[in-house]
């Protein structure tokens, strides 16, 4: 119990010292050159805040979801050594049907088309 109290008091002391040091140190003002983007010594050609394509975002999310689902299929051959086929085959078929229905749904809604 004394070890916990000792570690807790050291943690509080370090937090107090860091807080006092943050208030004691002078505030540094930033100038325009420090806050401007650096691009290999040249002035930036375009704005750094370009709008992001929502279509690209959706395709990236779809890729991650399908990639995760495919990664969940990898342990099925190893599970066939432990689980009887009468249990494993229906589970894997349900999983494949869900994966296929998701693909068909995205295909019908146009989520896989890059250009309109």
Curated annotation (Swiss-Prot):
Catalytic activity: a ubiquinone + NADH + 5 H(+)(in) = a ubiquinol + NAD(+) + 4 H(+)(out)
Main localization category: mitochondrion
Domain of life: Eukaryota
Record's keyword terms, sorted: Electron transport, Membrane, Mitochondrion, NAD, Respiratory chain, Translocase, Transmembrane, Transmembrane helix, Transport, Ubiquinone
Annotated localization: Mitochondrion membrane
Chain segments annotated as transmembrane: 4-24, 56-76, 88-108
EC category name: translocase
Its EC number(s): 7.1.1.2
GO cellular component terms listed in the entry, alphabetical order: mitochondrial membrane; respiratory chain complex I
Molecular function (Gene Ontology), one example: NADH dehydrogenase (ubiquinone) activity
Matching InterPro entries: NADH_UbQ/plastoQ_OxRdtase_su3, NDAH_ubi_oxred_su3_sf
Mode of membrane association: Multi-pass membrane protein
Function field: Core subunit of the mitochondrial membrane respiratory chain NADH dehydrogenase (Complex I) that is believed to belong to the minimal assembly required for catalysis. Complex I functions in the transfer of electrons from NADH to the respiratory chain. The immediate electron acceptor for the enzyme is believed to be ubiquinone.
Family membership: Belongs to the complex I subunit 3 family.
Alphabetized PANTHER family for the sequence: NADH-UBIQUINONE OXIDOREDUCTASE CHAIN 3
Protein known as: NADH-ubiquinone oxidoreductase chain 3
